[in-house]
Amino acid sequence: MIRPYLVALLMAFAIITPAAAQPGSASSIPQSALVQPEELAASLKAGQKPVILQVGFRKMYDEAHIPGALYAGPTGKEDGIAQLKTAAASLDKTKSVVIYCGCCPWSRCPNIAAAWKTLSELGFTQLKVLYIPNNFGADWAEKGYPVVHG
């Protein structure tokens, strides 16, 4: 009799737990650090060009990316973190930097939190994260925001 209740309780806990901000998850990034796609697109259109780093997979970058974005490696892996650190080494830590991935839904992105943590620890003071809730195609390209192919 107790077993079904225990199973139900454990299932409820499993459902609720991922919603909490966990270290290493995108939800651990402060809301104040997020920039919405329409905000970044408007800034680019107005000529305000932050340094933009794509921290996802190379194939995605090659298929389509934000104009001017630099590829900085898939930061969900150690070699990607090393690649990001190399890309960041030549950047002014006081200038505006926007990072994005867009490989998958925000809550499952393996790259964005690691990139945020790495650049924050390196001392970047004007660091923002492009909030892409679904994926780059749906939340940027299909909305008509500027894209470079290749």
Write out the residue ranges for each language-model feature.
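Short active-site oxyanion
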Residues: 44-52, 68, 126
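Bacterial N-terminal signal peptides that target proteins for export
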Residues: 1-7
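Rhodanese-like catalytic fold shared by cysteine-dependent sulfurtransferases
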Residues: 17-34, 62-150
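Bacterial N-terminal signal peptides
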Residues: 8-17
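Active-site-adjacent beta-strand anchor residues
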Residues: 14, 54-55, 130
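A short, well-structured juxtamembrane/interface segment
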Residues: 31-43
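Short amphipathic alpha-helices and their capping/turn segments at secondary-structure boundaries
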Residues: 41-46, 87
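Short hydrophobic beta-strand that contains or immediately precedes a catalytic carboxylate
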Residues: 40, 51-56, 69-72
